[in-house]
Amino acid sequence: MDKINNSKTAQHDNVESAPNSGQSLRPVSTDNFESSATDGREGNREHSRMKANRIEMNSINAQRGETKNEAVSMTQYNNLQQQIAMLQMSLQSMMKEKNKQTEKESEEQNNEIAKHISNADINTDTESLVKPQVYIPDKLQKASTSQITDADSHHRSKPLPKAQIDGSLDLVSDNVQGKGPDHSTNENTSVMKTISMQPNTMTASEISEISVGSMDNSVFSVYAQAVISERGVNAIPILRLTDDYKPQNLVNVVANAIPTLFTFHSIHEQKLTSKELEIKPREVYKELTLDQIAQSMDFIKDRTIVVSVVFEPRNLPNFKMSDDDINYLRQVVVLGSQYNANTTVTEVSRRLRNMIMLIANSFVLVKDITKCVWKRKRQETKILTPMKTFFKNDNPHPMLGVRNHAAAWFTKAMIEQFEKYPITIQETETEETVLLKRFGNDCNNRSVYGATVNNTVRLLKGNTLTVDRYLTMVRANAFGGSAIVSQDQGDSGLRVLFYPPRHAWNILLHRMLMSTTFSDTVMNHYVKMISDMGLFTMQDPISFMSLMYQQGNNRDNVLTSIFGAIPKVSEIDFITMFIMEHFSWKYDVIFTSSINITVESAIPEMLSILYTMLFFPKLSQNGMHTLLYRVMLLLRILDKNGMDQLLRQYGAQVQLTPNGQVAELHITEVIDVISEQDARNGLIHAIGYPLVCLDQIQELWTSINEIINRRLPQVILKRKQNANYPYTRDDYVAYASYGNMEGQTVVGTGFEGEFLKYIRMIQSIGKDMFTKVANQSSVSVLNSMSRGTFNTFIMYLGNYESSIPKVVRSLSKVSMLLMNSWGYVHEGYNDACIVTPQRLFGITSGTGRNPPIGLRLKVKNTVNIMTGMTVYIGLEGGTLRPTLSGNLLNASLSIRDTRSIKTVVPFDAVKCTDHGLALAKDCYRFGVAMSTLQYVIKIINARENEETYQYMKDLKSFFMMRTFAEVIDDINTIFKVNLREIMANSVVLEYTSDFRVESLRLVYQARDDIGPETEQGTAFGRLINWKDDIVQDNIHIAAKLMMPDTSPAYLNQKGVILKRYIGQLIKPSLPVITNDMHIIDYQESNMNFKFQSVSETTGVSFTFRDKNNMLRTVLTPESDELINVVLRVGNPGDIHVQWKQFIEQSILDGKLGVIFTDQRYTYKICYWNEASVPIPDQNDLVNTLLYSEGGEYLTIPFIDTSYAKRTSIFTSGVHTYKSFIHPLETTHITGDVITGIFNTVTKPHEFDIAGEDQLGYAYRSQSGIDPNRSPQSGIPKMMNSVPIMNNPINVYTAVPVFDGEINVLVQPPGML
C-alpha cells in the first residue's frame, strides 16, 4: 500500500486543478513518474519496476497468446495497482471540493476496491492463464456537464487498424475490430491487452445522478464472433468495404452528329487512277448552301465514274473496327499435331470481333441536333423543293447532289427515282414523348445502324423510370409505414431515366446466387448503409467486470471463464453478422469454440450458444450440426447423469427421414462429430430432435430442446412484390428472424413476447445448470466467490429483460426492410428441417437427372463462427439508457452508460434504391454481353440451312472450351464485364462449366445428389432470359452486317472461276462461261475424265468426254488444241497435287478453266481508268488459289475497265486486257450506288442507279406501314442483304437530362 500511496502522491501533483476544468482527465503515463517521484530511492525503484513491467507487457502483447503466463499475470497485477492508485488519487481530489459525507462514502468505497485487488493472490495455473485477462472498470468517469468523447471512454493500450466504412478493410486477426461511422476517435479492442484506466473524478452518488438525455440504449443482444475461412486465412467476417459501385454507361450519347456505318466514296476521271476519294466538302459550297448538300454535290460531279458505299463507321463512340489478323483459336493441338489456323479462322475471328464490338456499341442516342431551314435562292428541283428541314452535320446523300448538276439527264433520272420513292425531311408525323421527336420521313443517309439508334430510343421509351414507379421502389427500401412523397417540380419532363426491364432484375438474381464477387458487393452495400444510420452501438462489458471486482471475485476462475466466452467486438462486427443472417444461403457455417470445456466455462458457453440460436436462427440452422455437437459435450460436463440417460434411451445420434420422422436411433455413448453431408442427410445429435420423453430426464433438457427447435414465422414481402424486385419464389414468402412488427403499436406483444419468453428461458437454464453443477459433490472449485459471480452474472443479464421488446422491435423493422429490398433474392431458411438442406446453385442447359453440358455448381464460402455473446449491444433511440443496479457489499451503486450521445440518422432509402438501379442497369449490360456470347455459340453451332454453316462447319470442332475461352475474354474486355463470375470454379465436384450451349436455365442440386433439381413456383428450372427484343434486334443487325457471305461490310462472295479472258472490256459482272464450253465435274473415279502421265513426252494425257459424247484425249502442253474445257470442283484441296502444275499452266495458256464452287473470299473492285497501262499480272494469284487447301478466306481483286476509255489521255485506238480471275455469281458483285456519270450531254449505257435494296430512299410514313420495313418487299430493312439508307431515326430535339434524379422525401414511421 505504501507503493500505491507513493504513486498516488506523485500523480496528485500532476492533476492539480483538473477537477475544476470540466474535462475528463487523461491517464498519466509512466514517464511522468520519473519527474514526479521525488521521494527517494523507493520511488525510483517503483518507477523502474513499473517501466520494466510495461516493456514486458508490450512484448507479451506483440506475441499475442504466447505462453508467458507468469509475466502476463505479474504485469496485470502491477497495472491494476497503478490504476487503483490513480483512481484513489482522483477520488481524494474530488473530496476536497464536495461535502464531507460524499467524500467519505467515495473514499471508503474505493479503498474497499483497492483492498480486494491489492491483496489478490495471482493465480498462476496454466489453464486459467491462457484465458483472456480481466479488465478493470473504466466507466467511473466524469460525465456531468462536460462532453465526454468516445476517446475518453474507450481507452486501449495500443490502437489497431481501423475499419473505414468507405475504404477497404482487410483484417486477418481474430481480435481486430472495425468501428462505426460516428466513432472516429474510437480505438479498437485487443482481447489480450491491458487498458489504461482514466482517473475517476466523480463520486458514486454523483454517478447515480447523471442525466444523459433522451437516449435509448435498449438492446440486449448476443453476438457470434465469426471467422471467415478465406484461402486458409481466418479473418473476422467483415466484408471488404469499398466505395459505392459505379456501373459502366450503357448508352453512348452522340451530340450534334448523326452516326453511320457506311460512307460514300467516289472515283472521278480527273484523277486518272483507281484510288478512291474520301468525301470532303469544297469551300466554294460552304458559302452558298448547307454543308450536307455541299458534300453531296462534291462527290457526284460532272465526270464521276462511280459512287460506292464503303463500310466506314463514323460518329460512333468507342467503336473501333478491327482489321488486324485475329485468331481466336490461336494454336490448337488436334490428335497430337498442331493445327495452324488458316485464313478462314482469321477471317471468322475478325468478323466475330467486329460483330461483338458493334453489339457493345449499339446503344446510341442522338441529341442536340441543330435543325436548319433550307433557303432556296432560285427554283430548285422536285427533290429539294419539298425538303424544308435539315440537320446540321448530317451525312451526305446522293439525292442531295443533283442540285445544279451539269448533266440534265442525270437530274431527270434521279427525279424519276424520287417519284417512285417520294421523300421529305420535314417533320410530317411527329410523336412527342418526354420531348422526344421521332422523324419517320427524313431522307438523310441512314445505314442499317440507324435502326440501333431507334432501338435505344425504344428502350428508353418503353422503360422510363416514372415518379410513381420510383416511389414504389423507394417504399420497398424504407421502413414499413414510412411516408414517401415526391418533391419534383415542373421540370421532370426534361428527365430521361432508364428503368431496367424485368429480365435485368432477374439477371441480378442470378448473379447474386452464382457470383461471390457480386453478392459480396451487395452485402457490403447493406453493411455500409446500416452502419451509416448509427443505430447500433457497442460497449465492452466493463460494467459487469467492475461489479465482480467490487465483490472481490477477481480470484475466481469463473469470472475469466465467463468473459472468455464474451468476445469484444464492434458495431461493424454485429452489423456484418446481422447481414450474414439474411444471406445465410451464401455460406456453409461451422460453429467452433476456442475454449477448453471445464466446469467453469461450460455454463457461459452453453448460454452463448443458446443466445446465438436465438438471435441468428438462420445461420444457426445452417451450422446446427456443429452447434449440437458442442451442446452435447457441454451437457455431458454439466449433467452427466442426464446425458447418460439420454444416450441409453435414444443414443448419441438420430437419423431422420426427409419428412422429419425418426428413421434410426444410434444407441451409443460416443459423442462423435457429425459431418456436414450427414447432417444435411438428416443425421443429427439426439438433443436436437424433439424427443417425446425428454422431459423425463429433466425440464432443463426440454427447455434447451425447445430453443433448438424454435421455428420462425412466415411473412409475405408485399413491398418487394409491388416494386417488382426479383425473388426466387413467386409467392414472395420469406421467414423473419425477428418477426414482423412493422404495423405493431403495442410493445411487448406478439413476437416480442415470444422472444422475451426465450430470453427468460435462457436465464432460467443458466440458473438451473449452475445449481446442478454446484450440487455435484465432485465439484469443489465452485466456492462461495464462484456462486457470487454466477449470481451477479445472472442478475446482470436479467436487468436487461425489460429492454428486449424494444430490441426485437428495432431488429425486426431493420430485418423487414432488408428482406423487402432488392438485394434479398432468396430465402435460405427451411421451417421443416433442423439443419438447412444444402443447395448448390447451378446453370444448365437441361433439367434431367443427367443434364447436358453447361452445369455450373457454386461451391459455397465456408465460414467458421466462434460462439460467444456480448451483453451490451446498444440501440441509439429516444428513451433513457438503462441503469444496472445491484447490492454490492451492502453498498447501493448504479452504473450508467456515460458515452457521448451519438446522432442517429434514418436509413437512406433513396440511396439504397439508386444503388439497386445502378446494379440492375449493369445487369442489363451484363445480359447484352451474355446474349452476345449465346449468339456466338449459335454461329459456331450453325445448322445446314443457316448462312454461317459453310465456313463454320469445319471450325466447330476446334472451338473447344480452352479455345472458346478466348472469345469469352474478348467479350469481357469489350463489354467491360466478367462473364466468368457465373461460371464454374469448382474443383470439388465432378461437374464443370461449359457455356457452349445456346440456352441456359437456373437449377439447384443437393450436394449428395446426382443431378440438378427444379421447383414449381420458383426461378429454379426456368430458362434464363438474358435479353429483350431490343437487344435481340441489335444482335441481328450486327450479325447480319458482319457474319454472312452477303455481308455488305465485307463484300463476301462464294464461287470463283480461273480462266483466261481477253477483251476490250473486263468487268466482274460479265459472264466468262459460254455455251460452247465443256463443263466437267472433277472426280478421280470418273470414267469420262482423267489425267494420266505420259512419260514419253514428259507431259500429261488428258481424256474427257465432250458434249457429243465422244471421248477425246489431248496431250498437253505439246498440243496447241483449244479444248474449251472447264473443270468444276468444290475446293482447290479436292484436286490431287500431282496435277496442279499441269492445270495451272493450262489455265495461263487458255486451254483449261476451273470453277471452284465452294471457295469463299472477300472481294474488292479495282476501277481501271488508265487505258495505256496494262492491268496487274494475276499469275501469282492464280497460283495462290490453286495451291490453297480450300476453306481459306482470300481477298480477291476484280478488275473493271469500263471507264478506261473515257480518260483524257486515251482518245483513239483499241486496247485489249487479259484477266484470269472472275466471280461465279455476278448478281450482287458490286457495292456501287451510281455508275457512269461522265457524259454531260447524253446518258451513257454504263449509267446505272442501284435499286431500293442498295439505295432505298425514305418514304412518306402512312398508316399501316412499318417505317422499319421496306415499303415494296415488306421485309425488315435490317434483314436485307445490303445496307438500306433510309431508316428513320429518332433524335432528341431538346436537351434532356439522361442522368438526373427524382427528388423524394422519406419520413420514417416514428421511433424505431
Curated annotation (Swiss-Prot):
Biased composition (Polar residues): 17-38, 56-67
Keyword hit for Nucleus: no
Composition bias, Basic and acidic residues: 1-15, 39-49
Keywords assigned: Coiled coil
Region spans: Disordered: 1-67, 145-167
Coiled-coil spans in chain: 74-121
Protein name (record): Uncharacterized protein S2
Organism (species): Diadromus pulchellus idnoreovirus 1
Taxonomy of the source species: Viruses, Riboviria, Orthornavirae, Duplornaviricota, Resentoviricetes
